[in-house]
Curated annotation (Swiss-Prot):
InterPro entries (alphabetical): Ribosomal_bL19, Ribosomal_bL19_CS, Ribosomal_bL19_sf, Translation_prot_SH3-like_sf
One Gene Ontology MF term: structural constituent of ribosome
Protein name: Large ribosomal subunit protein bL19
Chain's role: This protein is located at the 30S-50S ribosomal subunit interface and may play a role in the structure and function of the aminoacyl-tRNA binding site.
SUPFAM superfamilies: Translation proteins SH3-like domain
Assigned protein family: Belongs to the bacterial ribosomal protein bL19 family.
Organism: Rickettsia akari (strain Hartford)
């Protein structure tokens, strides 16, 4: 491992120390919570910055794994229009990533969904079976 890879691994460890990034891929529906700064002007003319969280839920149509510059592209339909937004995976702006549904697809990049709408843009759902553990009372 060269110096740059080692430096990137250290930075990734620092950025993910207080948040957990789930394992997801193209075809999964995710809910990304992002920190947003709102700027407002008070009555006395001073500017006030407030931080709030904004959720963005949509289908992952592409994922790019490149160390600290990894990113993923999320597409959703808002008011009848397709909206795509790229998120940097390890960005401090991204507060949390939650997987809502797991999808079954045969491609790594789902750019063909841009040309589809309605039923033809649906993705089959992949069901995850979690093994239940039995507790034994002594």
């Amino acid at each position: 491992m060269n110096i740059i890879d080692h430096f990137e691994q250290e930075n990734i460890a620092k950025l993910t120390a207080n948040k957990q990034i789930p394992d997801f891929k193209a075809g999964d529906t995710v809910k990304v919570t992002v920190k947003v700064l709102d700027r407002s002007i008070e009555k006395d003319g001073k500017e006030k910055l407030t931080e709030r969280f904004q959720a963005y839920e949509g289908l992952v149509i592409a994922k790019r794994n490149r160390g600290i510059t990894s990113s993923f592209l999320v597409r959703k339909i808002s008011h009848g229009e397709g909206v795509e937004r790229r998120f940097m995976t390890y960005s401090p702006i991204v507060h949390s990533i939650n997987v809502v549904k797991y999808g079954v697809v045969r491609r790594a990049k789902l750019y063909y969904l841009r040309n589809r709408s309605g039923k033809s843009a649906r993705i089959k759902e992949r069901h995850i079976h979690i093994a239940k553990t039995k507790t034994v009372k002594a």
